[in-house]
Amino acid sequence: MYTMELRFIRGGVCAVDGVLAAGCREGKYGVGLIINRGSTAAAVFTSNRVRAEPVKLTERVIADGSISAIVANSGNANCFTGREGMDDARRMARKVAESLSMDESEVAVASTGVIGRRMPIDKIEFLIQSAAAQLENSEAASGALAEAIMTTDTFPKEVAVEFELETGEKARIGAVAKGSGMIAPNMATMLSFITTDVDASSSELTEALRVAVDESFNMLIVDGDESTNDMVIISSTRTSGRIDSNFREALVAVCRELARMMARDGEGVTKSFQVDVVNAGTHEDAKMAARAIAGSSLVKTAIFGADPNWGRIVAAAGYSGAEFDPEEISVTLESDSESVVIVDHGDILAFEGTEELETAERVMTSKEIRIIVDLAAGDESATAYGCDLTYDYVRINAEYTT
């Protein structure tokens, strides 16, 4: 899948030397800190017209291409909170700055949780102070950070890789993320913080991050709702070799791994699935078809019900806007242990009484399923990620205050 060797390692954001992290939680509220003083940075933010106050603040903070700290809280989104909400976001930055002897203009702020309620700022400031006293460069510190920013997540999400740049120098990327519900392009209800040691300017990091986000988080659909607080930030110590194509490929791999974790952790999820659209006429066609299939409520419910309903898959491809000949489409279902072609160049193979249908039904009982759709229209491909739509999803969101 990748043109170079990637070694997955432990450590999350702290896999990069010099990066400090910490996380504290008290009840439903948590605070995570990442310290990377004077780092080169770039970010991608939600495209929702309703934007949370920390998103607005961090856009300004990161505009000069450098940050020293990231503070993120869970339990309150600080969105639709007006001037008071912006004051609260600034107080978070100020508390970090005071605790760590830096300027508040160097502090990026992120929030996730309930929309439309004032931040319990005194509690958040207390948690910031507590986290600041626990900062260290360790696997445990990154893990505490990942846990502190969880909301409806059921497990913390971290990944780190080591790889060689084209010069032969070793480089690293580490990351944490949160996200399980309200996930749809563009981006997802998610926060992700990425660290690296590659030598790159802010504009170079921005370009690489946008490509990686587009090929990963923007191809992830849990429930089709787009958040007000989405944020992906990358910061670099610039202590390794120059940015190159190997770094860009590794960054895509890291973001895709986080996206897969989020798909597995969608609210109420019992199964996750990957949609690979191959042999499309254009890359955009491949992406449109993959997104449509991964986002289809009918496909999601078929996954939940272990129903190999190929009709829902081809219907979603058909309304996606991708150009292809329906009489040439092929569909394959795969699990870790077996694979079956259910539609072959427009011919239905999986119908009542066939071995193909029996195999397809077994595949659909797997916890992780791969759907391969061959459009037979070119040589472009794309991958999207999704999860099933369950009774528990409805229950969780019926009981959760927006």
From Swiss-Prot:
The record marks A188, T189 as: Cleavage. Its EC number is 2.3.1.35. The record marks T112, G113 as: Involved in the stabilization of negative charge on the oxyanion by the formation of the oxyanion hole. It comes from the Archaea. Substrate binds at T151, K178, T189, E267, N397, T402. The keyword Transferase applies. Gene3D superfamilies: ArgJ beta chain, C-terminal domain (3.10.20.340), L-amino peptidase D-ALA esterase/amidase (3.60.70.12). It is an enzyme of class 2 (transferase). It is found in: Cytoplasm. Signal peptide: none annotated. Keywords: Acyltransferase, Amino-acid biosynthesis, Arginine biosynthesis, Autocatalytic cleavage, Cytoplasm, Transferase. The active site is at T189. GO terms for biological process: L-arginine biosynthetic process; ornithine biosynthetic process. GO terms for cellular component: cytoplasm. Pathway: Amino-acid biosynthesis; L-arginine biosynthesis; L-ornithine and N-acetyl-L-glutamate from L-glutamate and N(2)-acetyl-L-ornithine (cyclic): step 1/1. One of its GO terms (molecular function) is L-glutamate N-acetyltransferase activity. It catalyses: N(2)-acetyl-L-ornithine + L-glutamate = N-acetyl-L-glutamate + L-ornithine. Belongs to the ArgJ family. Heterotetramer of two alpha and two beta chains. Catalyzes the transfer of the acetyl group from N(2)-acetylornithine to glutamate, forming N-acetylglutamate and L-ornithine. This is Glutamate N-acetyltransferase. It comes from Methanothermobacter thermautotrophicus (strain ATCC 29096 / DSM 1053 / JCM 10044 / NBRC 100330 / Delta H). The lineage of its organism: Archaea, Methanobacteriati, Methanobacteriota, Methanomada group, Methanobacteria.
